[in-house]
């Protein structure tokens, strides 16, 4: 909250994209040891500033927090959305690697327009 307030106070929040999270969550239950394993089917990301619609919650997990149950987002969707917020069209960003043209978002990815301000 302090970072967001400081950027807002300085007039920099609209031009700064804040991203917090990871490409996987944790299993909602113990795995029989002291920890919980990775869970790529249900995870949380936080985006603020930089063209993101504030106060928006997008998607939903099942009642256990195990898997996306509503509006699932792939890591490619997240990358496409972040690139869009930075003013880049992910479909136009290609590079040549091992005799193949590749996009930064691989062969998938859609901008999540519902979170764009």
Predicted regions and their residues:
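Ligand-binding pockets and gating/stacking loops
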Residues: 1-117
């Amino acid at each position: 909250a302090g970072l967001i307030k400081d950027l807002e106070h300085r007039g920099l929040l609209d031009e700064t994209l804040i991203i917090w999270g990871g490409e996987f969550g944790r299993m909602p239950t113990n795995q029989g040891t002291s920890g919980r394993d990775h869970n790529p089917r249900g995870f949380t990301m936080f985006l603020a500033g930089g063209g993101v619609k504030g106060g928006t919650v997008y998607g939903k997990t099942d009642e256990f927090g195990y898997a996306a149950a509503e509006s699932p987002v792939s890591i490619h969707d997240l990358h496409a959305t972040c690139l869009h917020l930075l003013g880049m069209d992910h479909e136009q960003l290609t590079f040549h690697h091992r005799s193949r043209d590749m996009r930064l978002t691989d062969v998938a990815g859609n901008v999540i327009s519902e979170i764009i301000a």
